[in-house]
Amino acid sequence: MRILLVTQMWPGPRDPDLGVFVFDVARELRRLGHEVDVSAIDRRGGSPAKYARLGAAAVAAARRRRPDVVFAHFLFPAGGAGAAAAAVARVPLVVMAHGTDVENARRSRVLATATRAVTARAAALISNSRWLADRLGPVRPPVHVIDCGVDLDVFAPRPAAAARSQLGWGDDGPAFLAVGSLLERKRVVELADAFAQLGRGSLAFVGDGPLRERLAGRPGVTLAGRVPHAEVPAWIAACDVLCQPSRLEPFGQAALEAMAMQRSVVATAQGGPPEFVTPQAGVLVDPSDGAALTTALAQAAALPAPNPAARAAAAEHDVRRQAARMAAVLEEAIAARRR
C-alpha cells in the first residue's frame, strides 16, 4: 500500500519533538511493509502561509507518487491539504482527529465550516479516543477509535535508583512528576498546591510555560524545564507517580507512556484517560474538585512501585498494534473505493 501521510506536526531540526507520535505511526506503517511518503510542517511558529505551502507540497507529492490513499493527521489544516491531495490523485482520504483540531472547530465558525468540508470528503475518520469521537458530532464517514499508542521498547521499565542517581532527583519520599507545558489548562499550580498539602516527597515539572514563576521556589518542587523527548523516559523512571490532572486531555499520552514504564498515574477524568487508566494503574481525578487532587496523590503513591499492572494496561496500546489497526482502516478505504 502506498500511503501519502499529511501532517502539520512532524519532527524537524528545530523542533525534534514535534509530532513524535505521528512519526512513530509512520515508522510502524513502514515496518509493516507499506510505502509512506510524508508532506509535513516540521517546525513551530511562522506565518499562516506555511499551511498553504503544506497544501501545495501534498498536492505535488500526490501527483508525483500516485498514492493508494491519503492519511491526514489533524482535521484542519492538514486535513484540508490531504483532501486536495486525495482529489488530485483520485484516491480515498482518511483523517485522524487528535484533539486541538476538534476543539478549534468548536470555537470558530470558519474552522467548523472547513472541518465539515474535510469530513465530508473523507472515506473514514480515526479518533484517538471515544471521548473525542463523541465531540465530533454527527459525521458522514465511519469513525474508528484508535490512538497513536506507545513505543513499548522506548518506554520500557527501568530501575528507579539508577534514574534518580542520574538526575539527582526523587530519593526523598514519593516522587511525583508532571510532563508538559506549564499552562493553566494543565492545572500545574493546583498540582503544586495539592503536593504542598500532602506534605511529603518531591515534585518535578518537565516542561516550560507562562506559569513557571508561580511554581518557582516552592519547597520540594523542581523545575527541569523542557527536555528532549529522548530524555523523558529517564524522568519517568525516576518517579513513582506521573501526574496529568489537566482540565481535560483528549487522549493523555504522557500518562500512557508512564504506565508503559510501570509507573502509576494521577490523570484527569475528563477526556481520554478514563479509557485506558485502570484502577490498578492509577487514580482518575475530577478537575473541578480541587480537594480531590491531594487525596489522589496519596492514593497513587500507595500503589505498587514499580507497578506491573500499569504496564499491562499500556501494552494494549502498543504502537505496533495501533499502526496495524490504522493500516486496516486505510486498506478498507481503498477497497471500498475500488468496489
What are these regions (language model features)?
Residues G170-K186, A192-A196:
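Conserved donor-binding/catalytic core segment of Leloir-type glycosyltransferases
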Residues S264-A267:
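Short hydrophobic beta-strand element within catalytic cores of glycosyltransferases
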Residues R247:
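Aromatic "clamp/platform" in nucleotide-sugar-dependent glycosyltransferases that forms part
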Residues E213-A230:
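Nucleotide-activated donor-binding/catalytic signature segment of Leloir-type glycosyltransferases, i.e.
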Residues W131, G149:
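Carbohydrate-associated surface elements
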Residues A156-W169, N307:
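A short helix/loop element that forms part of the nucleotide-sugar donor recognition site in Leloir-type
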Residues R226-V227, A234-C239:
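Short alpha-helical donor nucleotide-sugar binding micro-motif in glycosyltransferases
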Residues R226, T278-P279, V283-G290, Q299-P304:
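Conserved acidic donor-binding segment of nucleotide-sugar-dependent glycosyltransferases
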